[in-house]
C-alpha cells in the first residue's frame, strides 16, 4: 500500500500530516509535512520537484493550429492520489468526532428539557393535593 510514496523514501506514510503543491516555472513542487513529535517546534517536511509534462494539442476544431501545454506529471498524480487518501481519511475522522460531539450536545439538551418537563408535571401533582 502507498507504493508511490514508498518509492519516494517515505517509510511511514501514516506519519504524514498534510501536503502542499505549487507550480514554479516548468516544475511542480510537492512538499509533504509530517506530524510533529512532542517537544518539536517545527514539523519535519520533505520537498520533491517534478518537471511538468509538455503536450502538443490541436488549438482549434479546424485542425489548423497546434499549441503546447504543460500538465502535471503522471507520477506526481499517483503520489497526490495516495496523499489525498491519507489526508482525507484524517478529515473523515475529525468530522466523525465533531458529529459525535454535536449529537452528544443535542442529546444533553433533549434530556435536560425532558427533566424540566417531568419536574414541572411533578410540581403540578404536588400542588393539586
UniProtKB/Swiss-Prot annotation:
Disulfide pairings: none
Signal peptide stretch: none
Superkingdom of source: Bacteria
InterPro entries named among the record's database cross-references: UPF0325
UniProt similarity note: Belongs to the UPF0325 family.
Protein name: UPF0325 protein PC1_0937
Organism from which the protein derives: Pectobacterium carotovorum subsp. carotovorum (strain PC1)
Amino acid at each position: 500500500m502507498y507504493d508511490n510514496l514508498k518509492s519516494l523514501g517515505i517509510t511511514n506514510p501514516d506519519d504524514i500530516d498534510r501536503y502542499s503543491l505549487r507550480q514554479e516555472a516548468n516544475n511542480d513542487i510537492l512538499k509533504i509535512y509530517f506530524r510533529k513529535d512532542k517537544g518539536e517546534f517545527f514539523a519535519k517536511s520533505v520537498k520533491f520537484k517534478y518537471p511538468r509534462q509538455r503536450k502538443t494539442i490541436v488549438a482549434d476544431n479546424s485542425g489548423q493550429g497546434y499549441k503546447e501545454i504543460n500538465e502535471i506529471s503522471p507520477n506526481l498524480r499517483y503520489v497526490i492520489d495516495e496523499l489525498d487518501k491519507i489526508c482525507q481519511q484524517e478529515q473523515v475522522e475529525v468530522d466523525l468526532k465533531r458529529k459525535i460531539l454535536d449529537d452528544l450536545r443535542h442529546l444533553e439538551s433533549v434530556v435536560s428539557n425532558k427533566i424540566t418537563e417531568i419536574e414541572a408535571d411533578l410540581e403540578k401533582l404536588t400542588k393539586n393535593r
